[in-house]
Amino acid sequence: MKYGVLGTGMVGDALATKLAQLGHEVMMGGRSADHKNAQAWLAKVRGAKGTARIGTFADAAKFGETILNCTQGSATLEALKSVDAQDLAGKILIDVANPLDFSSGTMTLTIVNSDSLGESIQRAYPAAKVVKTLNTVNIQVMVNPVIVPGDHDLFICGEDAGAKQQVTALLREFGWRSIIDLGGIVNARATEQLMPIWMRLFTMFGSPLFNFKIVKT
């Protein structure tokens, strides 16, 4: 499978590295084709089972059969403007970002309550199959869930059932066992709005290596 990873930060690096290690073809895209972070990633994954290359956001979107949005959530929609909508049409777009704003000194969400980043992307690119997932865990947990002991859950939502099935299969490649399908993309609101409690727990624990577990009768 060919994956286009949009974003050269820590999230994009972690996911692109995991995909390459699993043997997939990966292109990391940034604002420029020669971004220093992308170049560092390319050097790091040399010798992985999969193939790796770098380019712009537009290059990665054109290359990938499945696209991962790993851009900073507050800047995602602006970043996606550089992508040709036709290069997203019919493709799965996995959105792992949260619309976070730290400019006031505390964390807030730039999109909240009656909307979400996941929904905003789906509206902007209606021909894409947006699937929201992995946005409720730290990057280390995203790609290596067993780092958190015991059973714990990952959420997924989106409009296209087939797309969610394909993303679920990828998540299982990552090692995820319990994946809860919340339904349509509107439920991205719920997962994005877990960020305040996630951040509070991170502050209390002094570590991001934790996750949520849903228990029912």
Where in the sequence are the language-model features?
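Short beta->alpha connector loops
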Residues: Q72-A75, T136-N138, D160-G162
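General beta-strand structural signal in soluble alpha/beta enzymes
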Residues: I54, K129-N135, I179-L182
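NAD(P)+-binding Rossmann beta1-loop-alpha1 motif at the extreme N-terminus of oxidoreductases
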Residues: M1-K44
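Rossmann-fold NAD(P)-dependent oxidoreductase module
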Residues: A14, K18, A124, L170
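Rossmann-fold NAD(P)-binding glycine/threonine-rich loop
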Residues: A97-V146
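Short, structured coil segments at secondary-structure junctions
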Residues: A89, Y125-P126, F174-G175
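Rossmann-like NAD(P)-binding element
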Residues: R46-I92, N98-G105
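Active-site-lining helix/loop region of Rossmann-like oxidoreductase modules
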Residues: H152-T217
